[in-house]
């Protein structure tokens, strides 16, 4: 099983934040690479922004409320005070990740669907799917009015888990999935079909 005492727990935490720092550094500096066309640099930046949002999503999924670093990566010579970041609330984390994904979607730089020639690259379909999944987590009892987490606060008393259930979050998740399904269908994606009589047959 995976819990806070697992060796992987600290490893995932550090690896994802390292990836976030690399993405932020790339976003800030890629325009210095004038050998690449502006359109290419824009595509790279949007891909990096989407990847950074994905890393934050994985951190939120694994650890709950996490510190959001923002646009500026922490400098190598940062003081201890600069390194210690208070956690952001669940709502702040979700809103940040959703905004980053939407920014990548709206940029016009990403491919609609990466396809075989660009496997592994972030595209609009992936960003929309991730945003929908993010909203589903947000609406779930895990993050939506979870009174079991009432004691999870920052040192200043800031509440990190919302303590009142908000049913409108389910509507946001539903709408996000509807938008994704409509878009994905238009891009040629299809649902995997399972034959009831042969459950192991794709």
Which sequence ranges carry the predicted segments?
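TPR/Sel1-like alpha-solenoid repeat signature
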Residues: 128-134
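Residue-level detector of conserved catalytic or cofactor/ligand-binding positions
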Residues: 192-202
């Amino acid at each position: 099983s995976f819990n806070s005492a697992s060796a992987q727990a600290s490893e995932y935490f550090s690896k994802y934040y390292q990836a976030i720092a690399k993405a932020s550094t790339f976003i800030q500096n890629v325009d210095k690479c004038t050998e690449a066309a502006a359109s290419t640099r824009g595509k790279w930046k949007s891909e990096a922004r989407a990847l950074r949002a994905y890393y934050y999503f994985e951190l939120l999924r694994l650890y709950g409320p996490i510190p959001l670093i923002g646009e500026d990566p922490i400098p190598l010579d940062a003081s201890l005070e600069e390194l210690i970041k208070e956690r952001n609330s669940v709502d702040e984390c979700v809103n940040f990740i959703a905004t980053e994904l939407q920014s990548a979607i709206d940029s016009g730089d990403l491919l609609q669907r990466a396809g075989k020639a660009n496997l592994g690259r972030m595209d609009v379909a992936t960003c929309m799917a991730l945003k929908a999944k993010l909203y589903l987590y947000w609406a779930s009892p895990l993050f939506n009015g979870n009174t079991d987490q009432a004691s999870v606060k920052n040192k200043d008393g800031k509440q990190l888990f919302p303590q009142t259930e908000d049913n409108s979050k389910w509507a946001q998740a539903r709408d996000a999935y509807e938008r994704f399904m409509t878009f994905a269908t238009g891009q040629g994606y299809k649902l995997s079909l399972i034959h009831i009589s042969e459950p192991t047959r794709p």
